Design a protein with these regions (language model features):
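Iron-sulfur-associated redox domains of electron-transfer enzymes in respiratory
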Residues: 2-289
Length: 289
């Protein structure tokens, strides 16, 4: 095994929102991932992120790392218009396929890479690479645990049987009822749409009760502020309700930890494109236990 990747402990948390309101509304929280992705793509780089199979576009602009599962890690290397499927939460384990090798080949060729994933995936990537690349940027997520793809598929089968049509799109956190009241939205091939408070669905309840997370999640070693990635992203649950923000809170606020010198440099470069308030790290931890 490769040595453990370096860990970083941030000094503070950032309550952050993308200045592009449309992009913010389309995102799970405040839209910071989109800023990182566009920054990388503008440099001629490549972005690795999770895409549900139901979302995969037919064009060659997205190179699909693996297909056939419920959630696949994909490489986006051309049109920023295809960024949409990478936005949003996916509450199911992703199939990394050959993405580590793809990332290494790109990095060896001098191509900037943004790799996003849960912290164990980022740590795995860094161990696989075995060395630092100055044009690699990583972001991990505050993770509740990853559900079994088999359970996810069984749940989709139930929805399809009830609707009599195949699922074409799943949005786990639709903001149509506001960021603080996330709704599940499932679109079917026949045009039908099923929406419900995610936490009231059987899948959402089981996820919240940790009934079908992968076994490794029970002994996760990444449940701390010591992070392997340059950035850590989450919803900013627990943000002081008395704090006045210059934007509408219920359109989404990201919790961002800047964990490295490389991350700080990119954060500063992107600062004209977002608003943010620096907050105590303890507040962010309390809101995302």
């Amino acid at each position: 095994l490769q040595p453990a990747s370096p860990v970083h402990i941030p000094a503070a948390a950032h309550a952050l929102w993308n200045s592009d309101e449309a992009e913010r509304v389309q995102s799970s929280s405040g839209g910071f991932f989109s800023l990182l992705a566009r920054h990388t793509l503008a440099q001629g780089g490549a972005v690795f992120g999770a895409v549900l199979d139901a979302h995969l576009p037919p064009s060659g602009d997205v190179a699909v790392a693996v297909s056939g599962g419920s959630d696949s890690m994909c490489l986006l290397s051309a049109l920023t218009e295809e960024l949409g499927p990478m936005r949003g939460s996916k509450y199911v384990q992703s199939d990394l396929g050959d993405t580590f090798r793809q990332a290494r080949a790109l990095l060896e060729a001098g191509t900037p890479v943004l790799f996003s994933g849960v912290p164990c995936q980022i740590d795995g990537l860094l161990r696989f690479l075995g060395r630092d690349y100055e044009h690699l940027l990583t972001c991990d997520l505050v993770c509740h645990g990853v559900p079994s793809p088999a359970v996810f598929r069984a749940w989709l089968d139930t929805l399809e049987a009830r609707q009599g049509s195949t699922v074409r799109q799943v949005r786990f956190k639709d903001k149509s009822h506001g960021w603080s009241h996330p709704y599940l939205s499932v679109t079917f091939a026949d045009g039908g749409v099923y929406t419900e408070d995610f936490n009231r669905t059987c899948y959402g309840r089981g996820f919240g009760m940790q009934l079908f997370l992968r076994p490794a999640c029970a002994v996760c070693k990444y449940t701390s502020v010591s992070r392997p990635a340059d950035f850590t992203l989450a919803d900013y649950w627990g943000l002081d309700p008395a704090l006045e923000l210059p934007v509408e809170r219920d359109k989404g606020v990201s919790m961002v930890l800047v964990n490295s010198a490389r991350g700080r440099a990119v954060f500063q470069e992107l600062s004209p494109r977002f608003g943010q308030v620096e907050r105590p790290l303890e507040e962010a931890v309390a809101g995302n236990p």
